[in-house]
Amino acid sequence: MNLAKNYALNYNPIDTVENLFSAQSYELDRRDENEVVVEVQGKWNNMLLFFAWEENMHCLHLSCLMDIKSTIEDRSKIFEMLALANEELWVGHFSYWTEQNMPVFKHAVILNDNEANVESKIAQVIDIAIKECERMYPIFNVVLTKGMNPRQAMYPKMMETIGQA
């Protein structure tokens, strides 16, 4: 059963991504018609944002890489950290890029031709990715480079939530 209508976009959302970042004087690497990469200055470190457009699915994918190279051998700590981080998310998820030994935030959005405010929607997805990476960077850093127990590393974040109740 296919409930999705067959929409054909009249544009490529990668162009919108390119326009959003170009307007703020960011350097972009347009790898091909459906991919672009941009490096943004973060609070803790630079982040690499990778965008890919999948035409058949009408899906714009965003990966935001945090430049934290893991030095720990115990992968169970890494995956426990990812699970704890993902429990707090409403959209997107954290993953681990094993080839580069670093965490990555991923999110995808379906874009149809008849949608209004596509630029605003894309900007919102970018903001969410950057904010989530900024929020979790210190925690990922102490787990991946110092070997701290993931639950201990998350404790200050849990206290923030309790303090706001």
Q: How should each PLM-predicted stretch be described?
A:
Residues 94-130, 134-147:
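Charged, low-complexity intrinsically disordered regions
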Residues 24-47, 51-63, 67:
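Ser/Thr-rich, low-complexity intrinsically disordered terminal regions
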Residues 5-6, 63-71, 115-118, 122:
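Short histidine-centered catalytic/ligand-binding loop motif
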Residues 23, 80-88, 127, 131-138:
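Short, intrinsically disordered, mixed-charge
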Residues 65-104:
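Short, internal acidic amphipathic alpha-helical interface segments
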Residues 7-28:
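Amphipathic alpha-helical segments
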Residues 9-13, 70-78, 121, 125-128, ...:
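Short amphipathic alpha-helical segments
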Residues 141-165:
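Short, highly charged C-terminal tails/helix-capping segments
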